């Protein structure tokens, strides 16, 4: 949704713990981050496949979560874009080099074939819809457990 600024209060009032926004959905990302913080909420910033890390790099110390989209937003069931693994690795490298503390979440086409690669690249949160609800005859618990590397 855009512009995102006018909806932040609605999400905060509805009880959201983390409010994640796209840089493209705001005229001033820093102001939107501060607006989210004014409601005592965690801040997430989402990077589309074609959004570069440098778009948010100077604000990473103010972000709780970076959501790396491994498909273009719009509909479920899309194929994972393997070139996104490099972006995840680069985010992890920046996080470690600058000693920052943010989660790396990946959403889009996550399945049993790519979950390990994504986690090893640096993701600690995976979003998976189609795999969770459709694999193994819809056995949600089994599918979630299978996506974990524990």
Question: Where are the predicted features?
Answer:
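N-terminal glycine-rich "phosphate-gripper" loop used for MgATP/nucleotide binding
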Residues: 1
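Short Gly/Pro-enriched loop/turn and capping motifs at secondary-structure junctions
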Residues: 72-74, 109-113, 132-133
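Conserved strand-to-helix beginnings and helix N-cap segments that scaffold or border functional pockets
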Residues: 8, 30, 81, 116, ...
